[in-house]
């Protein structure tokens, strides 16, 4: 497994076929948020050349110079695969920390 930045087309293609797909997990939503001061990050996990997890991650600079991150409607991932979920979550945390992130809000589109 490898944590990667995704191209818009490959992200949207994966997202459109995922069971937890939502408009809030599309590059179109990311572009709309960019017009309001957010930064768009399309991140994923690949197993070989196959995407097995992805997320639109948005970031915005706070008044104190650090960034808040937000994964609208959570990750597009198999939430029953704990190994994959842990791998992706840890890499998302590292990614945000490397970009001066102070927190990540995640609101997954799952029933509980």
Regions found by a protein language model. Give the residues of each.
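Conserved donor-binding loop and adjoining core beta-sheet/short helix segment
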Residues: 31-110
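Short amphipathic alpha-helix that is part of the acyltransferase structural core
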Residues: 1-27
């Amino acid at each position: 497994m490898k944590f990667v930045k995704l191209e818009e087309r490959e992200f949207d293609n994966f997202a459109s076929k995922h069971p937890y797909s939502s408009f809030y997990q599309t590059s179109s939503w990311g572009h709309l948020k960019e017009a309001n001061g957010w930064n768009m990050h399309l991140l994923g996990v690949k197993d070989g050349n196959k995407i097995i997890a992805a997320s639109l991650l948005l970031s915005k600079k706070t008044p104190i110079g650090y960034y808040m991150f937000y994964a609208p409607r959570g990750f597009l991932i198999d939430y029953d695969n704990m190994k994959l979920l842990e791998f992706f979550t840890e890499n998302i945390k590292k990614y945000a920390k490397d970009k001066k992130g102070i927190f990540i809000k995640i609101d997954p589109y799952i029933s509980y």
